[in-house]
Amino acid sequence: MTRILSVFKTAKTGVLNAAAHRYRGFSKAGVRLMSVKAQTANLVLEDGTKIKGYSFGHPASVAGEVIFNTGLGGYVEAVTDPSYHGQILTLTNPIIGNGGAPDTKARDAYGLMKYIESENIQASGLLVLDYSHEYSHWGAVKSLSEWLHEEKVPALCGIDTRMLAKKIRDNKGAVLGKIEFEGQPVEFIDPNKRNLIAEVSTKETKVFGKGNPVRIVAVDCGVKHNIIRQLVKRGAEVHLVPWNHDFSQMEYDGLLITSGPGNPELAKPLIQNLKKVFQSDRPEPIFGICKGNEIAALAAGGKTYRLPMANRGQNQPVMITLNGQAFITAQNHAYAVDNNSLPAGWKPLFVNINDQSNEGIMHETKPIFTSQFHPEANPGPVDTEFLFDVYMSLIKKGKGTTLTSVMPKPALQSKRIDVAKVLILGSGGLSIGQAGEFDYSGSQAVKAMKEENVKTVLMNPNIASVQTNEVGLKQADTVYFLPITPQFVTEVIKAEKTDGIILGMGGQTALNCGVELFKRGVLKEYGVRVLGTSVESIMFTEDRQLFSDKLNEIKEPIAPSFAVESVKDALEAADKIGYPVMIRSAYALGGLGSGLCPDKETLTDLATKALAMTNQILVERSVVGWKEIEYEVVRDAADNCVTVCNMENVDAMGVHTGDSIVVAPCQTLSNEECQMLRAVSIKVVRHLGIVGECNIQFALHPTSLEYVIIEVNARLSRSSALASKATGYPLAFIAAKIALGIPLPEIKNVVSGKTTACFEPSLDYMVTKIPRWDLDRFHGASGLIGSSMKSVGEVMAIGRTFEESFQKALRMCHPSVDGFTSNLPMNKAWSSDVNLRKEMAEPTSTRMYSMAKAIQSGISLDEINKLTAIDKWFLYKMQGILNMEKTLKGSRSESVPEETLRRAKQIGFSDRYIGKCLGLSETQTRELRLNKNVKPWVKQIDTLAAEYPAITNYLYLTYNGQEHDIKFDDHGMMVLGCGPYHIGSSVEFDWCAVSSIRTLRHVGKKTVVVNCNPETVSTDFDECDKLYFEELSQERIMDVFQLEQCDGCIISVGGQIPNNLAVPLYKNGVKIMGTSPMQIDRAEDRSIFSAVLDELQIAQAPWKAVNSLDDALQFTKTVGYPCLLRPSYVLSGSAMNVVYGEEELKTFLAEATRVSQEHPVVITKFIEGAREVEMDAVGKEGRVISHAISEHVEDAGVHSGDATLMIPTQSISQGAIEKVKIATKKIATAFAISGPFNVQFLVRGNDVLVIECNLRASRSFPFVSKTLGVDFIDVATKVMIGEKIDESSLPTLERPVIPADYVGIKAPMFSWPRLRGADPVLKCEMASTGEVACFGQNVYSAFLKAMISTGFKLPQKGILIGIQHSFRPHFLGTAQTLKDEGFKLYATEATADWLNANDITATPVAWPSQEGQSGPSSIYKLIKEGNIDMVINLPNNNTKYVRDNFAIRRTAVDTGTALLTNFQVVKMFAEAIKYSGDLDAKSLFHYRQFGGAKPS
């Protein structure tokens, strides 16, 4: 539906110029359409169905057969295909008209229509869901609406095209209908009773390519001009003759029977003429296309029949019977040849892999062949265009040439790979650029291997991942929590005797490790076969020079570039190319080490930093401002290729795709552009030898067909996960099957259960991905986004208009956001001197809000387009949203029209957003909406746009529909997922959600899952009974809960976002399982919780709830500094800070108040020198039935998410542990806990103080569960649903389970290299992006393995030490240990003096600010020369040389040098180096087998 449905429907007709002022940026045609009442008409079907639509074509009634096409593009070509003559065409692609219409009168050099497929529009009428009145494409000269008016063709939008497609499908593909305008009644007409071929065929002979050497007679059944073009450009002179012309006596070198509409049996003269040729001895080759296939079969004596479901789309898979090769084809036909009716001498040439229908025939001895599909495409894929070459070869080679002799031979034959045990490498801890998508892909790979009875060994230190579960039907046979390094992988290969390895499911980490194993000869030595893409092919894609060379071999363009290995060479390369240039690193992840360099100074800086991390960079011409387009390509070992999804970055080149807003499918590309890039994708992937799945990225010039290839990722990637969830096509699962040698046609499409995986999904919706950044956490870090990725997570929203999915996605990213508004997330205020033009030209994480503000400020769309290079089509849509906001704000709540309200919902407005515009609360808006019967519809993702029924329940909600796709009779248990990964909420909460879902299903409960994160396992549709890929908001949860009539809702396993919804959902009638939401509210509110602790006589630090700065100052005078500020209802320590003085107090209090506006901020005395202890537990009606106690390595002051955890505790006294248990017991009772919870304590000696309590699962639940061998979420879920539990084996407070012969260490994973300018020190506010865990026979070996797993490089030579004076009394022993272990010590001047004075030799180095002066060597030089390979820098609030110490830490990070900034970690590291012994490569199972976690 379109803008005209509501606001523009009710707008008064006025002077056009006045309207133009109101809708700045829109074309006059668009303004005219928006300024008058939209004309309506009805679509009436012969069964009596009547659907109202809105006219955007010629306002005249018409009747015909209603059919649907599932193609994702090419509406210009489609409507001019003569095969649609007499038909009312329904396009399931939901958004039509984006690219307008080209010059529809233009002709090419051959005299053929240049941009369309016949002289005029052939469809009798057009039906779409959403029509774009404002178009944007460099090749357009008018709108689709204007063209339809010119040709007097009616068209309606606002039609639920999915509903219509299902109706046509279920009626055996044949439905008569009419578009009927008021006062223009028409009767139903069945065009199939007419000879449609006669109606569209030429009335006279026409010649094209006159003078060409090969004479072809083409019998016109309704020819598409591209068929003629394909022949003429290959040297044919084409004589196009009428359908009933007797060609049997004509002279020709070849005969062609073209495509066309209708029932082939009505073309009797043509059939008779062709039969005469068949029965003669004429040797000339004959080719039939589409209708030509049916005519040929009838002339040969065969039969045709009407298909139960017509094949109309651009993704039909066919197989050639000669060699089994598969192709993706464009099709448009309702009739098919009956294979069983073919007479002797004839046989099928092509077969449809889905429905097994005939797709072409051939004569066994004569040069006659046909295709039911369209090899000329237009629209659609050009995979079978080679058939024109085959036809021309038959002609040119002459008599005696057989079809098999000229048909291309398949490049490869697929053979099942015989492996017994496969090693799958995971990606390790989550980091920026490498997040939860690899948990999803690895889990899928394990599932695929198990289906094929292949044993799996999984190696991944990411303890929080679902794939590293040790038990379950979907889990690997053996799991190793070890670093993904060549050393440890080699040990596992030796121990497990694996004969296969998969490198493509673990991101860059696994890929780089695999390449190194290959280079060292390890894989060859132990007979390990790389499954899927070979290492050689991986190296072609990762090494920038090799990649460039390979593309040059096939003459595919990349940006002019030079691979260099020094800064000097980089500067020389830039001089040759010309500034600006882009640099990219080899073997790097997420654009790390890349950047735009406008000048020599920037290039010198970026190249220096990049070459510190890698040995090669590429300096290339900048294509900033071009469109960035991605294709996901799957290729099997038999050379079958499909492109599963194309994606368009809303942000232009210059912003890393991981930091870009991305839509799928592409919205602003023509069919020509899409098919050009698709064909290139397949060509490149074949040339590189990819086997499995890969991603290819293009830069496409915004106003021409010029493109360059940016890169190829020969592995599963972030984009792969997005494409999988966007389409429903399980890429990782399919890639794993392909890696075993299974060809695509033999793999089932799990969504339909009937069709093959050798196809390309059709979408009748669109998705929008928006990244989630947490840059505000990193003081000093630049807010600019560019070619190096900075986002920590992402969301994906599904809708049937761009605006619907776009606004959904914005809200998914930040619960505080209403949609596309000028209000910043988290209630932030705009700077008083904000420069909107600069904000748009230099992208930041808040650019979308800047654009909204700019539009509202009157900056034109043309200027915004110039500043951002964002296509104007997206800008038109954004402006439409803001126009609706203006309309709503000008409306009265009691009189707002139903159509306006409905339209606002159709373009993605939330109840809360509408309420703010109308002056209503969210609840009042919901009541208003429901009273007007404005409700969402549930739709399925089925991969085939309703062409086949789906057997999975992968769902979303939309207001752009007219029926539900499913029934609501399960009444399942709802589980809320974690939403976008961000700092503090990562894969550990997905693990919790999945564990809960699996438990529910195990005990026989139906499950309804709601989540919006495409990187998660919980959003795998086969993990639950119903998956709603939807917002985690009060409005949407209530929609789903009420539709499904769920038995209850579990909110405690998804982290803080669902936890914050507990009270509002409860107050609106949602049954919350487990602990009461009112108790959750008491625990989340810092002041109430502290008061309860006082009542329970549980010790805590002195505290006070403060409502003003004066309150806070009064408290600090009483207890003294330092103090800790703690807002309520936050995750990962947001706005939590230790303050050491009044100025800090003022700054941090303002921040804490902003993020916690509805609850008081609590200030507590900060206890120094205390150790933090965590209690993870499960309560049952106030009783603790399962618990685990872990100890932090770091003292308090470091956020628990950034801390290094140890199980069992190492330094906590038994007396303190008992106090921890007593306090836990009291809290569980006081809050009547039923479900998971976490309590954090401070311990100093035997003194124990409570810090906080979370009445939900914590991020350490996966770690404690796997370490102890007890799934805490399984237990908690059973408690919450009232399932009976055997408590005898659980680690209760009375019977703790403590590992006896091993220790588990969980270590944080940081992404400092990406956050330029951020200070890599640990504070109260969490900064880590992921975590790992390893196990060892002692704490030291576990610690070192965990550190290595984070990417920490153990030093081999020298260590630089710089410590603040107060650390000296405790540090001397550590320094001595490091010296004794053989490290050469360097130190900043004061630290060096102190060490030397204490007989520990240390070489002094200059402060960064003193570099270049005479005296000690510079830090940078020592690091660059390899003398220093670890830095210990221990600052505190009294540090003198603040800038210099920061410079040292940043230098370490930017050069990839190991860095430690916490004293307790440094101490543990030194002891571990001394006492750890050899680092074994055992799995957790090995430790448990010979020792284990035992009841104490």
Curated annotation (Swiss-Prot):
Regions annotated as coiled coil: none
A GO term, aspect molecular function: carbamoyl-phosphate synthase (glutamine-hydrolyzing) activity
Residue range of the transit peptide in the UniProt record, numbered on this chain: 1-33
E.C. designation(s): 6.3.4.16
PROSITE patterns linked to this entry: ATP_GRASP (PS50975), CPSASE_1 (PS00866), CPSASE_2 (PS00867), GATASE_TYPE_1 (PS51273), MGS (PS51855)
Region (Anthranilate phosphoribosyltransferase homolog): 34-214
GO annotation (BP), single: glutamine metabolic process
Highest taxon of source: Eukaryota
ATP-grasp domain location: 548-740, 1090-1281
UniProt-listed InterPro entries: ATP-grasp, ATP_grasp_subdomain_1, CarbamoylP_synth_lsu, CarbamoylP_synth_lsu_oligo, CarbamoylP_synth_lsu_oligo_sf, CarbamoylP_synth_ssu, CarbamoylP_synth_ssu_N, CarbP_synth_ssu_N_sf
Keyword Ion transport in record: no
Keyword Translocase attached: no
Glutamine amidotransferase type-1 domain location: 215-401
GO cellular component: carbamoyl-phosphate synthase complex; mitochondrion
Record domain MGS-like: where: 1352-1496
Record: residues binding N-acetyl-L-glutamate: T1388, T1391, W1407, N1433, N1436, N1445
Subcellular location per the Swiss-Prot or TrEMBL entry: Mitochondrion
Catalytic activity: hydrogencarbonate + NH4(+) + 2 ATP = carbamoyl phosphate + 2 ADP + phosphate + 2 H(+)
Catalytic center residues: C290 (for gatase activity)
Keyword vocabulary terms for this entry: Allosteric enzyme, ATP-binding, Ligase, Mitochondrion, Nucleotide-binding, Repeat, Transit peptide, Urea cycle
Activity-regulation annotation: Requires N-acetyl-L-glutamate (NAG) as an allosteric activator.
Described function: Involved in the urea cycle of ureotelic animals where the enzyme plays an important role in removing excess ammonia from the cell.
Protein name: Carbamoyl-phosphate synthase [ammonia], mitochondrial
Organism: Aquarana catesbeiana
Biological classification of the source: Eukaryota, Metazoa, Chordata, Craniata, Vertebrata
